[in-house]
């Protein structure tokens, strides 16, 4: 069957449904295509966090604008999204992470975010069920919170359909073809759909679909795992993260403690099954943090896939005159979805990119990264470092936990252990330097997992990155913010 629309949206997650909602409010003829069911991808499998904190600098203003919408969304959408704005604490378990977290707080404050450092006593006063002996402190953003992802996405979806949006579920897009008439033809197994504008909000299917239509983008699917316990008495209202890993946890409105995400795996296939080893690690980790939680029964577990980019920010840009991509939200797109949907609708209706989306253009990956980025290997090299950041340290001092032997047996060959000098006023924390090194030196990094120190001279802050002390200075070439210090010879300062 053939269909015609003003705008086709591919993807029934938070970005796709929010965009459909805002477009129909303006009277646009919208057709939404979803290969499974609404919220069946990353949105419905997410942790439910609604946060501005712990983001790269360019994304903070977007997150702040989006979080400002949440208090009124239940009324606007006509459904209780179970939004709780009680703050987000990013817990610090060891001294290794105290100073880095404090420096990162200062970075976020410089972008207008209300975030502060709490010492152990303050954290425990705010959240008594936490285990005192395992908490050094935390970053705290009181305006952050959490919600029910299913209620949020179905709220936007229902409002969009009430506004006139048409929907084809269980409808997988196979290809998108441009025509001389200015229309795009979207091909599915059962339908052919035409529209001048196609918005791809396709989540974990984005990289493969973009590749089929001629665009090889640095999007790699990462698999997250989640669990939820039986309903428990009230423990806390806040959303929690952990500085040393991607573990999150929150207590839902029905009392279950939803946690997971601490184990990240690159997903070469679309497999959302959970693994016993990962589940045991996550359970052990949260049990060290929360009193008596190890006694709670688990009700269910699930996995999810979400595309990530090298710099931790989404790609929101036109691929050609017909196709607008919004993908690569790196596991934290639920909070920004409502505002991204509004801005995407504004973009296609007014034919001008909103200033708020300027940082997310695909051109930032031109050059070396666009040709060298592959999901296999590069992500594994970066993610594999997560488990070694504390494990290799036998020190309790600040700022020296990441010392490792140089790659070369003769320590004088490269002057011993090297330290890269970073300008803290310019660095945004995007980790492009780390990713560049892991890509360019993929085999050596995956074998050795060696590190150097990145030093913020003004703050005595040591940030670990993956490196094998190469002469090519891939990290310097990858830095988009002129944050890396150079010496009089133009080499990276050490």
Would you name each region that the model predicts?
Residues 192-236:
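Central helical "cap/lid" subdomain
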Residues 48-126, 246, 277, 285-287:
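Dinucleotide-binding Rossmann-like beta1-alpha1 core, especially the glycine-rich loop
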Residues 81-90, 104, 117-120, 124-163, ...:
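Helix-loop-beta segment of a Rossmann-like dinucleotide-binding subdomain
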Residues 24-43:
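Glycine-rich FAD pyrophosphate-binding loop
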Residues 399, 405-408, 432-453, 472-494:
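Iron-sulfur cluster-binding cysteine motifs and their immediate structural context
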Residues 149, 288-383:
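C-terminal catalytic lobe of FAD-dependent flavoproteins
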Residues 231-325:
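Active-site lid/adjacent beta-loop-alpha segment flanking the redox-cofactor pocket in flavoenzymes
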Residues 139-194:
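Helical element adjacent to the flavin cofactor pocket in flavoenzyme catalytic cores
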């Amino acid at each position: 069957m053939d269909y015609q629309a003003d705008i086709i949206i591919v993807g029934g997650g938070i970005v796709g449904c929010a965009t459909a909602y805002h477009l129909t409010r303006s009277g646009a003829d919208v057709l939404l295509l979803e290969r499974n069911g609404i919220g069946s991808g990353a949105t419905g499998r997410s942790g439910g966090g609604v946060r501005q904190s712990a983001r790269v600098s360019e994304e903070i203003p977007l997150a702040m604008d989006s979080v400002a919408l949440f208090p009124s969304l239940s009324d606007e959408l006509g459904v209780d999204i179970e939004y709780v704005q009680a703050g987000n604490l990013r817990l610090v378990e060891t001294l290794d992470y105290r100073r880095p977290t404090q420096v990162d707080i200062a970075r976020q404050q410089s972008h207008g975010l209300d975030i502060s450092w709490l010492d152990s006593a303050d954290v425990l006063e705010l959240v008594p069920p936490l285990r005192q002996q395992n908490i050094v402190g935390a970053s705290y953003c009181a305006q952050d919170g959490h919600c029910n992802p299913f209620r949020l996405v179905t709220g936007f979806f229902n409002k969009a359909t009430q506004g006139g949006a048409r929907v084809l579920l269980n409808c997988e897009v196979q290809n998108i073809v441009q025509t001389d008439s200015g229309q795009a033809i979207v091909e599915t197994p059962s339908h052919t759909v035409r529209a001048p504008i196609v918005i791809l909000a396709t989540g974990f299917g984005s990289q493969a679909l973009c590749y089929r239509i001629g665009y090889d983008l640095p999007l790699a699917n990462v698999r997250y795992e989640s669990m939820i316990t039986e309903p428990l008495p009230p423990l806390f209202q806040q959303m929690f993260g952990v500085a040393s890993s991607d573990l999150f946890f929150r207590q839902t409105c029905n009392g279950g403690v939803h946690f997971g995400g601490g184990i990240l795996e690159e997903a070469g296939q679309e497999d959302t099954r959970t693994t016993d080893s990962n589940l045991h690690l996550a359970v052990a980790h949260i049990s060290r943090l929360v009193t008596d939680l190890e006694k709670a029964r688990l009700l269910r577990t699930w996995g999810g896939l979400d595309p990530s980019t090298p710099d931790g920010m989404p790609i929101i840009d036109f691929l050609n005159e017909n196709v607008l991509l919004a993908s690569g939200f790196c596991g934290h797109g639920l909070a920004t979805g409502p505002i991204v949907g509004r801005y995407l609708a504004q973009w296609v209706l007014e034919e001008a990119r909103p200033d708020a989306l300027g940082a997310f253009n695909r051109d930032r990956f031109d050059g070396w990264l666009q040709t060298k980025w592959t999901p296999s290997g590069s992500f594994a090299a970066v993610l594999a470092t997560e488990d070694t950041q504390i494990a290799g340290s036998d020190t309790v001092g600040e700022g020296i936990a990441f010392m490792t032997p140089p790659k070369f047996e003769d320590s004088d060959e490269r002057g011993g252990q090297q330290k890269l000098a970073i300008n803290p006023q310019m660095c945004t924390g995007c980790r492009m330097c780390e990713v560049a090194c892991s890509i360019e030196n993929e085999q050596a990094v995956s074998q050795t997992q060696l590190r150097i120190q990145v030093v913020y001279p003004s703050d005595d802050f040591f940030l670990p990155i993956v490196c094998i002390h190469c002469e090519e200075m891939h990290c310097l070439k990858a830095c988009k913010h002129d944050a890396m210090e150079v010496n009089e010879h133009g080499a990276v300062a050490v």
